[in-house]
Amino acid sequence: MAGKARVHELAKELGVDSKTVLAKLKDLGEFVKSASSTVEAPVVRKLKEAFPADGAPTSPGRATSRPGPPGGGARPTPPSRPGLAPRPGPRPVPGRPGPLGRPGPATPAPSPSPASPPLPASPVQASPVQASPVQASPTSAPAAPRPAAASAVPAPPMPSVPSAPSGPRPGPNAPRPGAPQGGGRPRPGTPVPPSGPTAGGPTAGGPTAGGPTAGGPRPGPRPGPRSAAPGNNPYTTPSAGPRPSAGPRPSAGQSGPPSTPTPRPSAPRSGTPRPGTPRPGGPRPGGTGAGGPRPTPGGMPPRPGGPRSGAGGGMPPRPGGTGGPRPNANMFQPRPAGGPPGRPGGGGAPGRPGGGGAPGRPGGGGGPRPGGFAGRGGAPGRPGGGGGGGGAPGRPGGGGGGGGAPGRPAAGGRGRGGTTAGAFGPGGRGRPGRQRKSKRAKRQEWESGLEAPRMGAMVPRGNGQAIRLPRGASLADFADKIDANPGALVQVVFTQLGEMVTATQSCTDETLQLLGVTLGYEVQIVSPEDEDKELLESFDLSFGGEYGDDVELSSRPPVVTVMGHVDHGKTKLLDAIRSTDVVGGEAGGITQHIGAYQVRAKVDGDERPITFIDTPGHETFTAMRARGAQVTDIVVLVVAADDGVKPQTIEALNHAQAAGVPVVVAVNKVDKEGADPAKVRGQLTEYGLVAEEYGGDTMFVDVSARNRTNIDGLLEAIVLTADASLDLRAPTEVEAQGVAIEGRLDRGRGPVATVLVQRGTLRVGDSVVAGEAFGRVRAMLDEHGGQVVEAGPARPVQVLGFTSVPDAGDNFLVVPEDRVARQIAERRQARERNAELALSRGRPTLETILERMKEGEKTQLNLILKGDVSGSVEALEDALLKIDVGDEVGLRIIDRGVGAITETNVMLASASDAIIIGFNVRPQGKATELADREGVEVRYYSVIYQAIEDIENALKGMLKPVYEEAQLGTAEVREVFRVPRIGNVAGSLVRSGVIRRNTKARLIRDGVVVADNLTVESLKRFKDDATEVREGYECGIGLGSFNDIKIDDVIETFEQREVPRA
């Protein structure tokens, strides 16, 4: 068989069933799933080589051959000519049977011929006859002959080849009494065995030694190649094909002389004989269908009392003849047989089908049984064919006729439970119900890992191990760290922490840490700096770090950051240094951007470059001041001489001290009235800045930015401080690295970033990545708008070519190629997105579901922020999120960006009911028309604190009004009047305030409120209706349906007034 072959095809070719092939493949180390699986050509060759080496393999469920006693008879051979009827035999004579001749091998006919039409079978009833003892061999077993069966269609005799004597072998092909052999009609191409003489018995025409044989001949094997087991051939059914018989078996009531035995070797062969092949072993033991006397083990005397019930000796046949239906097998109990206990079939081996069986085991015909079919002849639990007597209770046997090998149903028979055998095995059991799995099925299921799913997977517990997780990590990330199932962690979080989280959702840091404590792990959240460091290390990159010994360092200019309180003159001082007017270009006269400039100052006759960074002094620009302090070498702290130290002054000083940079104090506005520079020196002494004239090491310089006084002294102090305390050197021949100070979206140039190079040289054409933005440097501009080809350390330039606007404060570095820059930026975007989702979602817990439902009713103000530079947008967002007007109103910024207001922003605002805040930007294109059409409100601001003030007022206006109770007046009841169709009316005297109609009232009796939430429905002054009655006047007050009014009660009226929110 070339190429791949299926298991059932190999089983058919080898003449075994599929289970045997599967077992053999497993023994050879090859795992095959089922009978329809394919195997490779090398495995097929190895399998074929293994079968001849092992001999005839034994399939599960078949009976094995056993050695028989010596001196047994021979097996009769099958006939070679079909179509001739056998001669009638004598009537059954009970007696001690001798050894039975074993049937010989089948001789196939040269060509199949159709059988003659069947003749009506007439049942022959055998009369009981006194048994005559017959001397048997010492190894024979006592047994009684079976009752005669009805004669079947006669078949021609055929000479058979005698076989050598061998031990007895139980024949699984014994015919059933009372049923026709061969299924009532000879099958085409099936030879019919003759009724020749048997060894050890009388010749033709005389009585047989073991009693009469069965009524008809057994069909022989089909000529040609041997057929596969029925369980492996999907195109054959047991009821249509020939029975895989090893040869005809003489049975009781057989007409004609017994067949001639065939000599066989006495050595037993392991395994089950295949159909159509000679069977090893000696003669079959006597009993029903025996051709000779049954051997008696140990020379035991015959059983007294004549034949036992069920032995077949002289017993009438079963009712029903040959064609009657067989009743349910479950209604019969095991019948005792003529053999010793545990040996069904008389002298057969235990568990083998044959003549009489032991109690509780399938055995021979145990007396009259209704039904025209014999019982199943096989070991319990094994599919046997027709043949040997009644089957076990509850298991109907196969049809009448020659019995097949154990495990294969006979021709014309049926599988278990009376159902036709399937393509890959015998049919089901006789009784309904669920079948039990065999050991092999359980073993294969266990080996294949087909286990039932278990509820509640185990989670490995820790012993305090540290686990590093990034911000916004999911439970799947946690499971990867501890080698657990993410679904199990979801279950743990839900059952033990009460939070509903999926395996892939981003979790908050608190949730991850609490889960770690629950499972015995120490969860460490990786900081953004460490995350970025690990990301760059994955690309063999690094930011910052120490210089190597082989790196050549060059001197660089100092980076000076000007810091201080708002309106203390920082930008004006820079204008004086640069001889420019930056303040005039700032809205509101305050700095709202961080700017970087490089100027050349003459110090001691030398022109020294100095890089200045201007930071805003407004309180909302804390992040800008912090970034300025991080990238600077020297901080110039500007303090107004007339104003002194202010909150932002202290904050700027703290930033400088945290960065560990030296500070130079510039006392500005010394020319202004009321200026007191000494006071400033004294105040800063409290914060650790001691002037040199006071014995400290901090240089104080008195300057006037307006009059440009003592500017050279300030520059000299900066240079001296840099030379004295700083080593201003950096490498120039390495990849450029630095910090993005500011970013904006230019209408004609696209994203523009102001970067400060810290090391290396930045050139046009380099691939750079800054935060989540990446690109290639298309052009570089200086502070005056001139082109720059390359920028060295401490040089601020504007870089064009980014794909998006970098955030202020992002680190930038040059990478080898654009692909690496894009991958780094994408990973940073994913990391930030996960962190934002973890913070924004806020996992719902079982305890906070109702609270969140209530929060859904809370009023919320949605905003979209657009600004000119990223630093201003960041400062505005931080300032707005700090506004707190109460829990009833929330502020949510759904989008922010740099650049003009676009139509996309308008559509997003329309869908989310948001307000657009434009900071130093205007609408683009038709955004204004679209906003008017969609009803979207757009606010424009150029000063940041104006935007903050308006948003705060809007939030306060969205608050729900708060009401308080205001007392209007009280009236004392003097008399109670009964008015028809109205009720009781209180004649009262107004003691204080005013009593008005339709106001709320309460009734007080003896200082206790009797009724509350009443309404003054009627108010009269004498007979006239009145709207209000003032103090000192009498009136009649009706409280509607409330009539429990008594004299001396007090009626108090009040109203709810709205209280303005603070």
From Swiss-Prot:
Homology family: Belongs to the TRAFAC class translation factor GTPase superfamily. Classic translation factor GTPase family. IF-2 subfamily.
Biased composition (Pro residues): 76-121, 154-178, 294-305
Region (G3): 614-617
A single GO cellular-component term on record: cytosol
Function: One of the essential components for the initiation of protein synthesis. Protects formylmethionyl-tRNA from spontaneous hydrolysis and promotes its binding to the 30S ribosomal subunits. Also involved in the hydrolysis of GTP during the formation of the 70S ribosomal complex.
Domain annotation tr-type G: ranges: 555-727
Skewed-composition ranges (Basic residues): 431-442
Entry protein name: Translation initiation factor IF-2
Keyword Cytoplasm in annotation: yes
Keywords: Cytoplasm, GTP-binding, Initiation factor, Nucleotide-binding, Protein biosynthesis
Segments for region (G4): 668-671
Broad class of the protein's primary localization: cytoplasm
Positions that bind GTP: 564-571, 614-618, 668-671
